[in-house]
């Protein structure tokens, strides 16, 4: 029977084969006509690659069927990218610790049972409520408006 082989260049080759012929025999005939070694040939029929150990009848290839010839690509992914090495270790992100009832550290109870605020709010109008002043040994400092209140020494 006669089958057609279509190459990537668009050229069509005609081959005389039998249904019992192996795929290796077909590749050998293509090598005789085109000079392409069988190990570089890939034959495709009905979207499937034809394996060397099978026959044409295994793939239901009949007379005047068209096989597509593509070349096998050798090689792989090329040069691998080298992993970067750093001289200093990577700085880990700080993990926030959730403290239960953390607000209580801003307030104290005096001997009468009254609540007293430990931190002082900034008196400046630009800061507003909720901006506390930092406690130093001899002064109080606002980090937002940079105002400083000096403590009176006894």
UniProtKB/Swiss-Prot annotation:
Pfam families: Ribosomal_S27, ubiquitin. There is a cross-link at residue 76 (Glycyl lysine isopeptide (Gly-Lys) (interchain with K-? in acceptor proteins)). GO terms for molecular function: protein tag activity; structural constituent of ribosome; ubiquitin protein ligase binding; zinc ion binding. InterPro entries: Ribosomal_eS31, Ribosomal_eS31_euk-type_sf, Ribosomal_zn-bd, Ubiquitin-like_dom, Ubiquitin-like_domsf, Ubiquitin_CS, Ubiquitin_dom, Ubiquitin_ubiquitin-like. The keyword Ligase does not apply. One of its GO terms (cellular component) is ribosome. GO terms for biological process: modification-dependent protein catabolic process; protein ubiquitination; translation. There is a cross-link at residue 48 (Glycyl lysine isopeptide (Lys-Gly) (interchain with G-Cter in ubiquitin)). The keyword Ribosomal protein applies. A zinc finger (C4-type) spans 122-145. Ubiquitin is synthesized as a polyubiquitin precursor with exact head to tail repeats. Some ubiquitin genes contain a single copy of ubiquitin fused to a ribosomal protein. In D.discoideum there are 9 genes: ubqA: 5 copies of Ub and a final Asn; ubqB: 1 copy of Ub and ribosomal protein eL40; ubqC: 1 copy of Ub and ribosomal protein eS31; ubqD: 3 copies of Ub and a final Leu; ubqF: 7 copies of Ub and a final Asn; ubqG: 5 copies of Ub and a final Leu; ubqH: 5 copies of Ub and a final Asn; ubqI: 4 copies of Ub and a final Asn; ubqJ: 4 copies of Ub and a final Asn. In the N-terminal section; belongs to the ubiquitin family. This is Ubiquitin-ribosomal protein eS31 fusion protein. The lineage of its organism: Eukaryota, Amoebozoa, Evosea, Eumycetozoa, Dictyostelia. The gene is ubqC.
């Amino acid at each position: 029977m006669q089958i057609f082989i279509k190459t990537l260049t668009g050229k069509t080759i005609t081959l005389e084969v039998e249904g019992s012929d192996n795929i290796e025999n077909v590749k050998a005939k293509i090598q005789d006509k085109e000079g392409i070694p069988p190990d570089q040939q890939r034959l495709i029929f009905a979207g499937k690659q034809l394996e060397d150990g099978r026959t044409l009848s295994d793939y239901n290839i009949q007379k005047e069927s068209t096989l597509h010839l593509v070349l096998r690509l050798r090689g792989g992914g090329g040069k691998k990218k080298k992993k970067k090495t750093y001289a200093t270790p990577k700085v880990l992100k700080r993990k926030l610790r959730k403290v239960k009832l953390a607000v209580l550290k801003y307030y104290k109870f005096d001997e009468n049972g009254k609540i007293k605020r430990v931190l002082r709010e900034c008196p400046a109008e630009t800061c507003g409520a909720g901006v506390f002043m930092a406690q130093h040994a001899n002064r109080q400092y606002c980090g937002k408006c940079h105002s400083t209140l000096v403590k009176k020494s006894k």
